[in-house]
């Protein structure tokens, strides 16, 4: 029987005893004879009653034969007169109250119960399992022994360099002497920085699973709560516990909640978070050398962290965790798919090529959506068709096949998307067009998907201008074929203007203004984002900027117009094909652009897309066989592997796999690269126009 059970039984026994005493005290003494009131009156009239004793509620008395009796007093106003008439002795006296000790119990027992309950909760809070009164105690969880994390380094894919640095940190704690012998100082802190979903917290969990030392984990929001001074107290308690368990690792997730830059702002010059940060700074820089406590932290907003928190001596290392490349995405897909049954035709390398810019969280969600899709179709294995549907769902949302649109609106969307596709297909420096659809998905009325041939981090001026021309191709197509323009191009115009403005004001790509950056951003640290831009240029420069934006947009618009006018027949063919089939994949677009007719519609668009993926996989396998054949005939295997891999990538790109999400690519590459996937929104999509920023 544990301590809690013993205390509960003791308090229960005390309560039962007290209740029993009260019942005993309030129990009425039993009378020898209990009469009804009418019987009592009959005996009075018969002269059988000798005397009565009238109390507050009862009438007690004695009959002439010596028998005692009791009856209830109903409050009869004529009772006294009746008793006098029949010469019954009457004794009327004040009702005695309860004894003094009973009254004492009435006041003492509630007070005693309150004290007992108070001490009970105090005992529970001091036992470590609860935090009822320990507001200043740290909420960090200790992972060691059976409570150690099950995540290991082999469960983290696509972050080889990041894992190497963290393995070194773990080795510092496991074998510190070999580093100390060389005069090396154990790092005091490691800061994991990167976009959301790239695996920073997962890396922390992997360190907890691999480290042979205690591991404390806590969130940045767990420090500051309702009471003043709680945050600093919890920081002190956390590091006191860490020192008792040294060597150990302390992991603070989302440290920007407590480590935001200090200074006067919307929150005032000094607040609870600032006091907590000051205590954290003192604790991190107050260690003895080689004490064996390493602080790990993760954040996706390193730009708002206090500079004193990031300096060497506190966070000696900053590890940037970016979105994975092609190889990393394939490894991540393998990790998430290893416990899921896949069909034989599933090629994760094809899926990885279709998802540039996806983070680890995106890929995990993709595989999970594919599993849900397969279960919905009552399948026991996941195939390429399910993965294709999952990619479309993650990128563009759920198909709105039930949405009813008029033929005129359908024609507007068809010509609009055909304009995007043709301009993007014909201009030499754009990404290949992989899918065009006029089926509404999510908030989009139709979309054109363009997949880059390789992971990109930089864009040239020519590529940006052609990107703008592709965005404007939808509006130009509406104007050429329908002699009318619609609100469907609103998001295209906004994005095109944004690209041109960035080219002029941030990238220095204007011929007239030259290689300069205009308009410095203001950062409000207590808001955690940039809410204003300094106008550090004159009105003449502002006029020149507006004029340059107009000229570049007009030039791109004219380029798109000339491209479509020269291929007006192809615009008509693709638009009609979209009206008929609703979705065109890369192979079908290529056939139409080459003047060929499409085969009859025999299967649904999902099956056509799946067939395209299977053909691509077969092409990849065929090239892999050719690679093995060529390896047998050449002496230099390494050179042959490199050449075959290049050919494999080139063939896959020529096959033009289906789409990828430009919006995801923008988020994971650089904030301004809103260039890989074009999704055109209707007038309903104004609320989603900032998705690509």
UniProtKB/Swiss-Prot annotation:
InterPro entries (UniProt xref): AAA+_ATPase, AAA_lid_3, ATPase_AAA_core, ATPase_AAA_CS, FtsH, P-loop_NTPase, Pept_M41_FtsH_extracell, Peptidase_M41
Q: Which organism is it from?
A: Natranaerobius thermophilus (strain ATCC BAA-1301 / DSM 18059 / JW/NM-WN-LF)
The record's Gene Ontology cellular component field reads: plasma membrane
**Known partners and oligomeric status:** Homohexamer.
Q: Where in the cell is it found?
A: Cell membrane
> What is the designated name of this protein?
ATP-dependent zinc metalloprotease FtsH
Q: Which SMART domains match?
A: AAA (SM00382)
Bias (Low complexity): 627-642
Q: How is the cofactor bound?
A: Binds 1 zinc ion per subunit.
Region Disordered, as annotated, extends over 618-693
């Amino acid at each position: 029987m544990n301590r809690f059970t013993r205390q509960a039984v003791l308090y229960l026994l005390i309560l039962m005893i007290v209740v029993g005493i009260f019942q005993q005290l309030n129990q009425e003494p039993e009378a020898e004879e209990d009469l009804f009131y009418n019987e009592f009156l009959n005996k009075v009239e018969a002269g059988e009653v000798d005397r009565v004793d009238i109390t507050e509620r009862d009438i007690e008395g004695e009959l002439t034969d010596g028998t005692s009796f009791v009856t209830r007093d109903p409050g009869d106003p004529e009772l006294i007169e009746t008793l006098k008439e029949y010469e019954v002795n009457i004794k009327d006296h004040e009702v005695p109250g309860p004894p003094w000790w009973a009254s004492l119990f009435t006041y003492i027992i509630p007070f005693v119960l309150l004290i007992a309950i108070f001490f009970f909760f105090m005992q529970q809070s001091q036992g470590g399992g609860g935090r009822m009164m320990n507001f200043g105690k740290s909420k960090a969880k200790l992972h060691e022994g059976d409570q150690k994390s099950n995540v290991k380094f082999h469960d983290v894919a696509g972050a080889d360099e990041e894992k190497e640095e963290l393995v070194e940190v773990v080795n510092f704690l496991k074998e510190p002497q070999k580093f100390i012998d060389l005069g090396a100082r154990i790092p005091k802190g490691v800061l994991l920085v990167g976009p959301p979903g790239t695996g920073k917290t997962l890396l922390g969990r992997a360190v907890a699973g691999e480290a042979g030392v205690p591991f404390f984990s806590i969130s940045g929001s767990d420090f500051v709560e309702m009471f003043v001074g709680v945050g600093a107290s919890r920081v002190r308690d956390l590091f006191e516990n860490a020192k008792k368990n040294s060597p150990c690792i302390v992991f603070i997730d989302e440290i920007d909640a407590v480590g935001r830059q200090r200074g006067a702002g919307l929150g005032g010059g000094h607040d609870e978070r600032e006091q907590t940060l000051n205590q954290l700074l003192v604790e991190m820089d107050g260690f003895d050398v080689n004490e064996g406590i390493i602080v790990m932290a993760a954040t996706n907003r390193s730009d708002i962290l206090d500079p004193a928190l990031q300096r060497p001596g506190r966070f000696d290392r900053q590890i940037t965790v970016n979105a994975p490349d092609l190889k990393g995405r394939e490894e991540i897909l393998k990790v998430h798919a290893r416990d899921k049954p896949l069909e034989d035709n599933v090629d994760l390398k094809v899926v990885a090529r279709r998802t540039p810019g996806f983070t680890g969280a995106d890929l995990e969600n993709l595989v999970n959506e594919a599993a849900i899709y397969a279960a919905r179709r009552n399948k026991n294995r996941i195939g390429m068709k399910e993965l294709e549907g999952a990619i479309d769902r993650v990128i563009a949302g759920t198909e709105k096949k039930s949405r009813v649109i008029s033929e005129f609106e359908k024609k507007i969307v068809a010509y609009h998307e055909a304009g995007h596709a043709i301009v993007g297909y014909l201009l030499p420096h754009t990404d290949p067009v992989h899918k065009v659809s006029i089926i509404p998905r999510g908030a989009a009325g139709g979309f054109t998907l363009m997949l880059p041939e390789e992971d990109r981090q930089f864009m040239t001026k020519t590529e940006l201008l052609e990107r703008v021309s592709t965005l404007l191709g939808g509006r130009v197509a509406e104007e050429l074929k329908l002699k009318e323009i619609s609100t469907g191009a609103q998001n295209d115009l906004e994005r095109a203007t944004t690209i041109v403005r960035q080219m002029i004001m941030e990238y220095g790509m204007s011929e007239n203004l030259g290689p300069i950056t205009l308009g410095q951003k203001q950062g409000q640290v207590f808001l955690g984002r940039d809410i204003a831009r300094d106008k550090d240029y004159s009105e003449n420069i502002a006029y020149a900027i507006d004029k340059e934006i107009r000229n570049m947009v007009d030039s791109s618009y004219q380029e798109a117009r000339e491209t479509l006018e020269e291929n007006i027949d192809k615009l008509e063919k693709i638009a009609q094909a979209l009206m008929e089939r609703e979705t065109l994949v890369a192979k079908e677009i290529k056939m139409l652009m080459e003047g060929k007719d499409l085969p009859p519609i025999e299967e649904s668009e999902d099956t056509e897309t799946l067939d395209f993926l299977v053909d691509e996989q077969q092409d990849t396998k065929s090239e892999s066989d050719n690679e093995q054949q060529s390896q047998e005939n050449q002496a230099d295997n390494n050179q042959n592997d490199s050449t075959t891999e290049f050919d494999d990538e080139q063939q896959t790109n020529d096959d033009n796999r289906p789409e990828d999400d430009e919006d995801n690519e923008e988020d994971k590459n650089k904030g301004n690269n809103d260039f890989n996937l074009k999704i055109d929104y209707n007038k309903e999509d104004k609320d989603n126009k900032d998705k690509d920023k």
